[in-house]
């Protein structure tokens, strides 16, 4: 809880210049606000309409002036208006009362559900946890999704990049992860919509309500808080909304001692917003026109996303890659912070393999014997090598047909196709579309299942029995059903 100084003790300044989202404010001598303090402007514009604007101090210019970035539109702002130094950074509500609600960058509810029932707030700027407070032992975060747990496992308190185009299942994967952490880990999630389409944010909210992740009748039973600063917002809001969502997640980790899932969609827009205001703040642009503080900006956000001895924040971040150029400074800087990458492939979605996670392109720093154990590591590598061989043989199959392959290669293709099908899985949040009940698969069941396919134990089962099932027992049951129907 951060105490805000009373209005009478707050310093008042005067707006002297407005350039787009950036404004200069003059204060009395010796009364300049601190960097990152929130300034509040409440006045009427020349047309008689009310203006209520919050801006964040970014620079001290000299001559008793500061330069600040507005968190909402500056239309109607004129020189001479009064600005009040709140004496503290932007603060947002935190705690259970945020679950099931939608907020803007300032922590104001925008879902027309009335005020937030909490007095607890926290500033969006704070230092990353100390090294002595960090949980340094790598621990795998079980998601219950076979392809992720086996081939690109997530680290508890780690950061995951989610790469995928439109319509390949990013949103459904995000929803399933939120659902699984709520049910299996008793945890909560925070979703930060950074500079993406407002329609997508609305669709996500409606889907959360349909799937029960947000309980519209009893918000206290909800498992996710949402924080949006979308495409239509000024760059100041898009630059800070990620921090607002992170602050809500930090409270669940540090105060409630919970494991939290933080989704950021899209991390590139956070960088893009910083780039937009950088030139207006008078900074010299750096490589490809990005802000010279790019590394610092990304680092300040990413270093706060971590595991402590109290709990963890595991972050899943959608990463837009401009012009598919992975060497662009924005994605390149982000990559340095990621522990795992989950790549969604349109070719797999077209085959009906859901989740459409590419088993060969997705990577994780956790997939090493010292972390996951020898059995898991060997199984994962054997699965990848079988799929890789199948990929190499596809050209030959397309030209000459399956019959021209050697006996060994035919067996490899048969097992690879079963593996590919077995990597699919019905999701809880997709039950209303598929009519199939969702499956959460334990890691040991996943490893055992793939080992049985690789060893040839299941060579006599039909390929279709492996499609959209949970563990290997369900495969056998489905095979029996297929056999009896013939």
Curated annotation (Swiss-Prot):
GO MF annotation, one: proton-transporting ATP synthase activity, rotational mechanism
EC number(s) from the headed UniProt entry: 7.1.2.2
Keyword Ion transport found: yes
Binding site for ATP: 164-171
InterPro entries assigned to the protein according to its UniProt record, in alphabetical order: AAA+_ATPase (IPR003593), ATP-synt_VA_C (IPR055190), ATP_synth_F1_bsu (IPR005722), ATPase_a/bsu_AS (IPR020003), ATPase_alpha/beta_chains (IPR050053), ATPase_F1/V1/A1_a/bsu_N (IPR004100), ATPase_F1/V1/A1_a/bsu_N_sf (IPR036121), ATPase_F1/V1/A1_a/bsu_nucl-bd (IPR000194)
Record's subcellular location: Cellular thylakoid membrane
Record-annotated disulphide pairs: none
Subunit structure: F-type ATPases have 2 components, CF(1) - the catalytic core - and CF(0) - the membrane proton channel. CF(1) has five subunits: alpha(3), beta(3), gamma(1), delta(1), epsilon(1). CF(0) has four main subunits: a(1), b(1), b'(1) and c(9-12).
Family that this chain belongs to: Belongs to the ATPase alpha/beta chains family.
Entry function: Produces ATP from ADP in the presence of a proton gradient across the membrane. The catalytic sites are hosted primarily by the beta subunits.
Record's protein name: ATP synthase subunit beta
Lineage of producing organism: Bacteria, Bacillati, Cyanobacteriota, Cyanophyceae, Synechococcales
């Amino acid at each position: 809880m951060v105490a805000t100084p009373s209005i009478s003790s707050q310093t008042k300044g005067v707006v002297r210049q407005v350039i787009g989202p950036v404004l200069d404010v003059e204060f009395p001598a010796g009364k300049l606000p601190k960097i990152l303090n929130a300034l509040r402007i409440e006045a009427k514009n020349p047309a008689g309409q009310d203006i209520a604007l919050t801006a964040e101090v970014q620079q001290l210019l000299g001559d008793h002036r500061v330069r600040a970035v507005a968190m909402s539109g500056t239309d109607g702002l004129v020189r001479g208006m009064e600005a009040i130094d709140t004496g503290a950074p932007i603060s947002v509500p935190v705690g259970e009362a945020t679950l099931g609600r939608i907020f803007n960058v300032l922590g104001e509810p925008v879902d027309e559900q009335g005020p937030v029932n909490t007095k607890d707030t926290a500033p969006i700027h704070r230092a990353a946890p100390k090294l002595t407070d960090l949980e340094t032992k790598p621990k795998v975060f079980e998601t219950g999704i076979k392809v992720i747990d086996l081939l690109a496992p997530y680290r508890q308190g780690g950061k995951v990049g989610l790469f995928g185009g439109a319509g390949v299942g990013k949103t459904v994967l995000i929803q399933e992860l939120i659902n699984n952490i709520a049910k299996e880990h008793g945890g909560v999630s925070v979703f930060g919509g950074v500079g993406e389409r407002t329609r997508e944010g609305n669709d996500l909210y409606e889907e959360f309500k349909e799937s029960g992740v947000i309980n519209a009748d009893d918000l206290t039973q909800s498992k996710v808080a949402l924080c949006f600063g979308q495409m239509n917002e000024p760059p100041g809001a898009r630059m800070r909304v990620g921090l607002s969502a992170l602050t809500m997640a930090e409270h669940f980790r540090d105060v409630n001692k919970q494991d939290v899932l933080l989704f950021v969609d899209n991390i590139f827009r956070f960088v893009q917003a910083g780039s937009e205001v950088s030139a207006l703040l008078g900074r010299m642009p750096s490589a490809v026109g990005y802000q010279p503080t790019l590394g610092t900006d990304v680092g300040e956000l990413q270093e706060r996303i971590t595991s402590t001895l109290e709990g963890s924040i595991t972050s899943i971040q959608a990463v837009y890659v401009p012009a598919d150029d992975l060497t662009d400074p924005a994605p390149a800087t982000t990559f340095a912070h990621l522990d795992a990458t989950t790549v969604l492939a349109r070719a797999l979605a077209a085959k009906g393999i859901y989740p459409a996670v590419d088993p060969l392109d997705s990577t994780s720093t956790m997939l090493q014997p010292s972390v996951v154990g020898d059995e898991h590591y060997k199984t994962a590598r054997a699965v990848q090598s079988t799929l890789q061989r199948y990929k190499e043989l596809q050209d030959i199959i397309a030209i000459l047909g399956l019959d021209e392959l050697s006996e060994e290669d035919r067996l490899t293709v048969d097992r690879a196709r079963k593996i590919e099908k077995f990597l699919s899985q019905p999701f809880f949040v997709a039950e209303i579309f598929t009519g199939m009940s969702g499956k959460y698969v334990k890691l040991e069941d996943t490893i055992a299942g793939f080992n049985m396919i690789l060893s040839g134990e299941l060579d006599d089962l039909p390929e279709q029995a492996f499609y959209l099932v949970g563990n290997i027992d369900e495969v056998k049951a489905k095979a029996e059903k297929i056999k009896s129907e013939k």
